[in-house]
Amino acid sequence: MVWDHGPTGRTVLTLSTPTTFAAKGAVHAFAALGRPLAPDVPHVIWAHGWGQDHHAFLALARSLERAAHHTLFDFPGFGQSPAPPQKADGSAWGTADYADAVADWLASLPRGRRIWVGHSFGGRVGLRLAVRHPAAVDAMVLVGSHGLRPRRSLVARARIFLRVRMFKTLRLLEKFGVDVSARKAKYGSADYRSAGSMRPVFVKVVSEDQTEDVKAIRMPMVIIYGALDDQAPPDIGERLSKLIPGSSLSILPGLDHYTVLTDGGPQVAHAVAKLLEP
């Protein structure tokens, strides 16, 4: 693993000249702010959602700047981090690969109290990290997190079934040389259509279900969802809170998948601040 030391202290590390670390063959760009990293200084790791980058959490991290050292990732494939390489078997990265890379990096750092804050995809990776590397962090805040398969109505399940059947038909037509790219774009989700070179990762990640795995998690966990979130419905949070012993759940009225980070920012910051208390 390679660690590129950038400036420390209370100045945000600009990603115009990104500070990076390399783990599991992937380069991770990141920004840092707050107190210098040291064994007696808490460390908050902010993990953004799919299609976002470190800026998603920058305002929240700044609000807690004096309380801890803060690292804000650009996960491989987002922001200024290049896409992760294919694995040796030719398959795409999944959440386990992202979690393993982060764990490798954390193992190289001074060991203070660590808190993982993950939104959406960042929550998926956090759950995987908590299961595969339970000693890597001490507590988590999950915000609008994915990780469990959402429960859908009969109508929604029928629509998904028809969409899957259409994709299978399109793949068959591709084998005969038919250009079906426009049709694929039509039937894919917005994230699927915009995924580009990250599409294999996206397809793998959204197919994962961590329901059985998360039962093994034993750490303080605060779970926050927006009541109007239609991308990571609060039902996921309700199930997570039942599966993870000792976790707490807050569902914020009137907020969706993204406003839970802005209008709901004070609640998220409060949850992190409570976990930072000695």
Regions found by a protein language model. Give the residues of each.
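Alpha/beta-hydrolase fold catalytic core
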Residues: 1-45, 65-69, 97, 109-112, ...
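Active-site loop/oxyanion-hole signature of alpha/beta-hydrolase fold enzymes
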Residues: 20, 25-26, 33-34, 72-117, ...
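Conserved HGGG/HGGXW glycine-rich cap/lid loop of the alpha/beta-hydrolase fold
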Residues: 33-82
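Flexible "cap/lid" loop of the alpha/beta hydrolase fold
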Residues: 127-132, 137-171
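Conserved alpha/beta-hydrolase catalytic His-Asp/Glu region
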Residues: 166-219
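Short beta-strand/loop motif that positions the catalytic acidic residue
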Residues: 217, 223-225, 229
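Acidic catalytic loop of the alpha/beta-hydrolase fold
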Residues: 228-232, 258
